[in-house]
Structure formats: structure tokens, C-alpha cells
Amino acid sequence: MTNQSLHVNIDKWIAENETSFLPPVCNKLMFFYQLNIMYVGGPNVRKDYHIEEGEELFYQVRGDMVLKVIENGKHKDVHIREGEMFLLPARIPHSPQRQANTVGLVIERRRLSKETDGLRYFVANSTEVLFERWFYCENLGTQLVPIIKEFMDSKENETGKPDPANPIKPAPYPLNTMNVMTPFSFREWVEKQKPVLASGCPVDMFGEQFETETLLFGSGTSANKRRTDGWIWQLEGLSNVFMNGKEYSLTAGDCLLIFGETEYKWQRSQDCVALYVAQDPDRKRPY
């Protein structure tokens, strides 16, 4: 399917690609398939808010960030500190604010053909919509640039007020009304789960109410075939994945992408701790 290596050492990849974290979005895709795995740098201070029908998983590798959101009609700053993880629910306007010398992981999925993304600007110090555009998102990193430029050149940006000649149209779907979670220390959470892992059971981080499946695995062997892509992040110990006639040996700090509809066998050592992430749109919550 691809000549790209599916087995990557994360720290080495970040070091090799950090110069590619360019404004205004500052992201570099590690994998761009059904599952999009990207790392994001800074500085990147933005005024636009992104809206999408899927979820986004955040983890801060280095330094802190602020994710500005609109929660139930009010502005809120979500501080995601180094080493913390956060799952953003679908359909919540959000605007990442990142400083220089920071690196964060963001995971999202390919959009379904019927899904629409939005880019929205607000009147200063309010939640009144100033300017927005809705579009089918194929590559956010490239598609945001012309929309941001259109806004910067617009009458709305010049005056700070909506343009009566271009009235805001109804959004294609309602915004999410749930409250966002509090970011948490990923490593502390992992340590607390080790007694459960020792019993041979994986731990579901977020539960079935989200379409993002984030499972922590300990030692053992499993065989599977999923409809969607899956991403393994080896945290501790060793594991071996067998698929398509190849063996992939993972050590701490490695990751591996498994394409959807691929049969694979996963053998995990006694001291293995690994995270498995998938995003299945069939698990989407109804509006």
C-alpha cells in the first residue's frame, strides 16, 4: 500500500522533522491515512477556531500549550501541560495556542465524505461569529492557509464587525454541549493502571462514549483485524507485531501504524506497556 515505513522511533522522527513545523499551523504529519498522526510545534498563536465532526487526542511531548475552546457558549482556556493528555470531543470550536520550543502530539481521523469542517472567527471578547467558512477537509495544514488569508484581507477583519452583505449562514450541524475534560498526567495514569495490566486485561482510557479508542496493554498475545487504522505506541518493554509476512520489533519509544483490514498478531513481553489508539466513525455520537 505504501513505501513509507510504518515502524518509527518517535524521538528520532521529531528530531529529523522539527524544522518542518512551520506557521501558521506548524504541524508535520507522521502518518496520513485513515488515522492522521501529527506532531505540532510553535510558536503558533491563532485567532481562528476549528470545528470538526470527529475527535482530537492531544498529548504534550515538550512544553505547555493552551487550547482555547467554546464550551456551552463561553470562552474557556484548557491548559495542557508537558506530559498531559486530553481528548477533545467532536463539534467543539477550538483554537490551539503554542509557544516556541514546544512539541505536541495530535491524533485525528480522515473525514467521511459527508462530514464538514469549519473555520470560525469571533467578534472580539464575544462569541458572536465574525467570519466563517465550511469545507470538506482533506489536508488541514494546506487548506487553512487560504482561508486565513481570505479573512485577513476581509472587511470583517478590517472593521471587527460582521459584514451585512455576507450574512453568516446556519451551521451544518449543532455544536456539542458537553463540558470538556480536565487534562491529566499520562504517565501517572499509566502507573495507576499497572495492577490491572498485571491481570492480563487491557485498560480503556476514555470508555465507549467516545469514538476514540485508547487502550493500554500489558503482557500477552492478541490477534486482530480492525476496520480502521490502529496506532501502537510502545511505552515500556518490548513487543512484536506480525502482519503481511513481516515482523516488527518495538522497543520503548517506538510506534507502529497498522492499516485497517489488516490481520495482525501482537506478542507483548512480560514488562510491556503499550498504548493502542484507533478512531472509528461508526462510534460517533448522534447530534
From Swiss-Prot:
Gene Ontology MF: a single term: 3-hydroxyanthranilate 3,4-dioxygenase activity
GO biological process: 'de novo' NAD biosynthetic process from L-tryptophan; anthranilate metabolic process; L-tryptophan catabolic process; NAD biosynthetic process; quinolinate biosynthetic process; quinolinate metabolic process
Region (Domain A (catalytic)): 1-163
Positions of Fe cation binding: H50, E56, H94
Gene Ontology CC terms: cytoplasm; cytosol
Location of the region described as Domain B in the Swiss-Prot/TrEMBL record: 181-287
SUPFAM superfamilies per UniProt: RmlC-like cupins
Subunit field text: Monomer.
Biological function: Catalyzes the oxidative ring opening of 3-hydroxyanthranilate to 2-amino-3-carboxymuconate semialdehyde, which spontaneously cyclizes to quinolinate.
Protein name per Swiss-Prot or TrEMBL: 3-hydroxyanthranilate 3,4-dioxygenase
Native source organism of the sequence: Danio rerio (Zebrafish)
